[in-house]
Amino acid sequence: PYPERYFSAVESGRRLLSAVPLAATSAGLSLMGAEDLRAGRAVSPDFTGAGWRDYLGYTDMPVLSLPEAGRAIATIAAGYDFSFFEHWPTDQAGHRGTLTEAVVHLEAIDTVLGGLLEVWDERHGLFIMTSDHGNLEEKSHSRHTRNPVPTLLFGRDHARHADAIHDLTDIAGVVRECLGLGVPADS
């Protein structure tokens, strides 16, 4: 979800849509906002929602525990054919943080995944977690790396799909297959 000031900045031309919002709006989808977060239809990129209270001034925003956030992600995803959760705090930690901060972020992700797995049902489909680049693992500089990034899969046919993924460019094909879309004609 995005705060109102994000939408205002885009509308005024002070900022451009970043990659995920651009893809969603280009597909005719509406971006989620504060009301979606309050209503439990979205999970904050920081997982808990504390950032909305502490940094964005949304004092009425509910705050989740990390396991609750994982369960919420699973519950929300179960209502859609395709669900995309963008978690960018690890990118910030990679650019500006210390190794200790990186470990804290990875432990948080582990706890969220534990909550998600408590309620995930294979009938929900396939869960894929990956990244578009590395940078959290390399603390000698603050740039993105070209290191291979891990991909985690669980759910329906996860082993078969894992065998089809060799790098980031293979993710789209797996998603298309799961959605029954086949291979694009121009591939």
Predicted segments with their positions:
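His/Asp/Glu-rich, glycine-adjacent segments
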Residues: 1-81, 86-93
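Short active-site-adjacent structural elements
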Residues: 93-94, 136-140, 160-161
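Polar, surface-exposed loop/tail segments
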Residues: 181-187
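Active-site-proximal segments of metal-dependent phosphoesterases and phosphodiesterases across multiple
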Residues: 93-111
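Substrate-binding rim/cap in mid-to-C-terminal beta-strand-loop elements of soluble/periplasmic
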Residues: 143-178
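Alpha-helical packing segments of well-folded alpha/beta enzyme cores
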Residues: 69, 73-76, 105, 109-112, ...
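Active-site proximal loops enriched in glycine and acidic residues that flank catalytic Cys/His/Asp
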Residues: 87, 129-133, 153-155
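Metal-dependent active-site segment of extracytoplasmic phospho-/sulfohydrolases and closely related
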Residues: 106-144, 175
